[in-house]
């Protein structure tokens, strides 16, 4: 993915409901082109916990949702299920199959935010991701961001503020070329300053991101932008039929740097079909 300063196109960043089946499969490098899968890194990836049953509200406090966290100021993670009438998308005449189990999560509930999880990783291993994504009101785009756990958790300075990952997607939208309306981009590499408190970065003056590493931009991130319509789930990475056939058009691998024992997997809105920031992309089966 080329990074160009003259790329100015920006999709309206909004809510994404993301139904994604994202498998993160670490592969130990044994020899050239020889890898062995060891375990799933992401937990509660199907968002089956906590179970809905007869709960009317689709929102759960993050501390009640195993393994996941959010940067939302209200600390709520929004779930969907046919049991609470929150089918996704809420349209007639389209397939409403849920990729795995009976629940999924909504990336943004009442505000734009990032849904994320820390995984224990082994330096030198390569992890592969796979996900199923779907728009809600039309074509929605999400960002998948993988990189090193920081000394400070990602955070928003206010309800309408931008956390570090959201700021990263803003930068990508201004500097990356080759963004497709549908499907998944090639892997984009971004370097940033270290995270600080309240959505800020260390020495948070000037640009927080760069296309190249330096003594200032020390944190390396891999970013993928994925766009899908609301008519059917789109399968990406290891969930794609192209992956099974051995002809995936992009890399779905993340190489863990030596010594990196904690890795963050973050999911945030890149753009949505409507201007309503409480509607967007579905996530499931990670």
Indicate residue ranges for each PLM-predicted region.
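Extracellular carbohydrate recognition and processing domains
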Residues: 159-260
């Amino acid at each position: 993915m080329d990074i160009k300063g003259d790329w100015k196109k920006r999709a309206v960043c909004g809510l994404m409901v993301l139904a994604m089946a994202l498998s993160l499969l670490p592969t130990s490098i044994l020899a050239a082109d020889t890898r062995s899968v060891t375990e799933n890194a992401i937990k509660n990836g199907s968002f089956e916990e906590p179970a809905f049953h007869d709960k009317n509200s689709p929102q759960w406090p993050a501390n009640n949702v195993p393994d996941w966290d959010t940067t939302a100021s209200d600390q709520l993670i929004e779930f969907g299920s046919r049991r609470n009438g929150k089918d996704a998308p809420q349209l007639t005449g389209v397939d409403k199959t849920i990729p795995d189990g009976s629940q999924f999560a909504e990336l943004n509930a009442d505000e734009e935010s990032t849904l994320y999880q820390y995984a224990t990783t082994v330096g030198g291993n390569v992890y592969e991701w796979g996900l199923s994504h779907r728009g809600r009101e039309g074509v929605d785009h999400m960002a998948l961001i993988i990189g090193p756990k920081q000394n400070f958790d990602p955070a928003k300075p206010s309800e309408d503020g931008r956390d570090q990952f959201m700021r990263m997607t803003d930068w990508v939208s201004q500097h990356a070329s080759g963004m497709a309306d549908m499907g998944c981009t090639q892997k984009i590499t971004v370097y940033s300053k270290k995270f600080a408190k309240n959505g800020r970065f260390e020495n948070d003056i000037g640009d927080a991101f760069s296309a190249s590493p330096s003594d200032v931009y020390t944190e390396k991130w891999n970013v993928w932008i994925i766009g899908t319509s609301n008519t059917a789930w789109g399968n990406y990475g290891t969930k794609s039929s192209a992956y099974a056939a051995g002809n995936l058009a992009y890399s779905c691998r993340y190489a863990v740097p030596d010594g990196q024992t904690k890795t963050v997997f973050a999911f945030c809105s890149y753009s949505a079909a409507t201007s309503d920031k409480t509607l967007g992309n579905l996530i499931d089966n990670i």
